């Protein structure tokens, strides 16, 4: 409840205009991981230091916000007779009816996502301390990355809106996280400020198989073998997240490095 208090006023303002955002388990979801490829992971780096890494976002309420404005954008494309190569490329132009509301809603969802991750990180550290039964403290910089969001930035001499979908900000010196699959290593990186990528880099390895294809093509035995040496779930319900469903993370990192992104 305490974590929700700073979010409440903004949420109430959103719901005054968009009642659909209510009843989205917004309070109950705060401090929860979610499904899909969301995870909490304990990692050892090359110095045998422990990193606690988690991947989660704005949960059900963020999904409702995104879905609602996507519907509005598609309707506006039809209303303005704008023909797109794909209907999923619908957009909300700056200065249009819903633009300011969209920016406000996405900004609030980013705040929710940040609060969600902070709450889970604190709970995870407390759980580790409870198990180890010895005091410890985290003495390194915490790294936080939004990876599905919009940001008002200055590029090529202009103020622009940057949409990062499955991408993180990689300004010069900025720290970022690029997770691998559940059977691969993850990387903590520093951005190089590449303007050609609008100071962005990959958020992860990226899929080479859809969830349904992975479930169809990968056996449980193959999944168990691929995650050998990793303490994680090894049952049929997580085969859609099996390592072979993703690109090799080393290849992704190599490409980012050679392209001066991170």
Question: Where are the predicted features?
Answer:
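Catalytic phosphate/nucleotide-handling subdomain of diverse soluble enzymes
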Residues: 201-203, 207-228
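Conserved phosphate/anionic-ligand binding catalytic regions in large, soluble enzymes, centered on
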Residues: 50-65, 197-211
């Amino acid at each position: 409840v305490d974590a929700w208090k700073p979010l409440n006023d903004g949420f109430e303002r959103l719901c005054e205009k968009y009642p659909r955002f209510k009843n989205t388990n917004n309070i109950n979801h705060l401090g929860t991981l979610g499904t899909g490829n969301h995870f909490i992971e304990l990692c050892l780096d090359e110095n045998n230091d422990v990193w606690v890494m988690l991947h989660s976002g704005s949960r059900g309420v963020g999904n409702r916000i995104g879905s609602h404005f996507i519907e509005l954008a598609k309707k506006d494309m039809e209303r303005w007779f704008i023909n797109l190569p794909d209907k999923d490329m619908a957009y909300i132009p700056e200065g249009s009816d819903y633009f300011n509301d969209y920016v406000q809603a996405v900004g609030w969802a980013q705040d929710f996502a940040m609060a969600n991750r902070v709450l889970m990180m604190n709970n995870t550290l407390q759980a580790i301390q409870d198990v180890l039964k010895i005091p410890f403290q985290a003495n390194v910089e915490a790294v936080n990355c939004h990876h599905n969001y919009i940001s008002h930035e200055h590029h090529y001499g202009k103020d622009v809106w940057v949409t990062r979908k499955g991408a993180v900000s990689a300004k010069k010196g900025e720290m970022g996280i690029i997770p691998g699959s559940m059977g691969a290593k993850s990387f903590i990186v520093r951005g190089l400020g590449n303007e050609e990528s609008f100071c962005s880099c990959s958020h992860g390895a990226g899929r080479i198989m859809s969830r349904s294809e992975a479930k169809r093509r990968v056996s449980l035995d193959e999944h168990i073998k691929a995650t050998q040496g990793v303490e994680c779930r090894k049952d049929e319900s997580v085969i859609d997240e099996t390592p072979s469903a993703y690109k090799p993370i080393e290849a992704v990192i190599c490409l980012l490095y050679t392209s001066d992104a991170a």
